[in-house]
Amino acid sequence: MNNAAKRWIAILVAAAVLIAVAAYAAFHFAVQALKGKVEEALGPAGEVAAIRVADGGVEIIGLRIRGDGAQGAWPAEDQLRAERIVVVPDLRSLLSSRVRIRAITVEGGYLSLLRTPAGRLRLLPSLLERPKTDGAPGPAIEIGRVELRDSALEFFDASVRKPPLKLRLEQLNASLDRLSLPDLAGKSKLDLVGVLKGARRDGKVSLKGDIELASKDSVLTTQLRGVDLVTLQPYLVKATETGVRRGTLDMDLKSTVQRHRLRAPGSLTLTGLELASGSTFMGMPRNAVVSMLKNRNDQIKVNFTLEGNLDDPKFALNENFATRVGASMAEGLGVSLEGLAKGVGSASSSAVKGVGEAVGKLFGK
């Protein structure tokens, strides 16, 4: 090899090294700029620990929106947080005009929601209650799958007591397929499972079906199994002198939402319900009268239908005649089966609606 050839090879190698260094520097600058943009979008209460490249995509570490950024008192330390978010792009979309993201995975996520004494749902107030600014809509983006792993959701209900009742869902794993941004149009398949924490025992929660985040239309099947009635006591017990000592709840709900109107036939089963002692009804111990409502399996079963407007927290509960007789006797005992069905049913509906609004706001709706 002559000297000229060697010189050209050296020049090409040096140029390649310089290009690689320049590309790395440019990419590092772009990642740091992205970190600043994300923090700006989250608002003054938001922060991001780091953004880097990993697992064939972009990794966001330590995303958080503090609770002190909310207008008025917020019942939780954080509005939102995520230990790790991985965004994996579809490289084939680089050659097209539409951006496609293959998957977004959130690990160690957390979201808090508050229902006010007036029944209004609040979540991510730092984002959703921020004054709107005029601006061009974001680019069209298609997301194949959003997945939530080992996350938690806390629902604070100030409409039933003060301080607010806290319901905590842990070990939350969920997936949402087919998401179009920024319009959120089209049906997405939702699959969610989690554990509802209780004072005496933990119950299981399952939610499956289709939802359109833009219109909030949905067809969902909700199942609760072995949920602690002590935790749900504010929904179940109306009389101040009555308390719940033990018991569990199973519930099945098939809900349909069209144009913000909900219709959800369902059934609930109370197993092993035992009220606090020391109170009577018509001269008899309340637990003795409760026993009269139970079947041979120590259960009280109720069929019901929730109907109403999602924008109105007050839902109508319709029951058949036989159920009304049992419910009327329960009302006299200071036990509200209607309140339990309304409270748990509307809480799950509010949570789904709230998460939909959160997704829309976070992704630029």
Annotated model-derived regions:
Residues 128-233, 308, 313, 319-320, ...:
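Elongated, acidic membrane-bridging lipid-handling scaffolds
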Residues 99-103, 145, 189, 217-219, ...:
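Outer-membrane beta-barrel architecture
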Residues 88-94, 114, 177-182, 210-212, ...:
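Short beta-strand micro-motifs enriched in acidic
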Residues 61-176, 270-287, 310-324, 357:
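Secondary-structure transition motifs
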Residues 41-44, 71-89, 101, 128, ...:
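Amphipathic hydrophobic-ligand
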